[in-house]
Regions:
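UBC/E2-like fold recognition across ubiquitin and ubiquitin-like conjugation systems
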Residues: 1-156
């Protein structure tokens, strides 16, 4: 059960998102968790000039009861081939782990995740195959990303 401080903070973070959603993000047409501030579904369009550019991914944030002291968890609900995302869609980024700061907002979290599509971090790979491929042969990695994007996340 979330306390009043957490609910106020969540309301402020959601208001910020509705007023200033980061670039490349959209709210889905029929959000599943529209009345639950502890759950957030957004769509992330791949950044231009990246192998992800032709795709749109559904992203889910689950906000814990003790937010902002504890970070939200983030999962891709659409399959993505990325060094920092495992098969279950879980995202590995230090901002949501060791580097979390209670001053960070949900908007900051979304910006951090979109930056991972621009600059993957193979040194903290959850997907070992993608991490090795990006380090050994970026062109082959980009081709694989484009193929997986066309299969799972293509823009209709």
């Amino acid at each position: 059960m979330q306390n009043s401080r957490t609910l106020r903070r969540l309301a402020a973070d959601h208001a910020q998102l509705h007023n200033d959603l980061p670039t490349n993000y959209l709210f889905p047409p029929n959000p599943q968790h529209d009345d639950d501030l502890s759950q957030l579904d957004v769509l992330l369009a791949g950044p231009t000039h990246t192998p992800f550019a032709a795709g749109v991914w559904k992203l889910h944030l689950a906000i814990p009861d003790n937010y902002p002291q504890q970070p939200p968890t983030a999962n891709f609900r659409t399959k993505i081939f990325h060094p920092n995302v495992n098969e279950k869609g879980q995202i590995c980024v230090e901002t949501l782990k060791r580097d979390w700061d209670s001053k960070l907002t949900l908007r900051d979290v979304l910006v951090t995740i979109s930056c991972l599509l621009i600059q993957p971090n193979p040194d903290s790979a959850l997907n070992a195959e993608a991490g090795a491929l990006i380090q050994q042969d970026y062109d082959a990695f980009a081709q694989r990303v484009e193929l997986m994007t066309s299969i799972h996340a293509s823009i209709p």
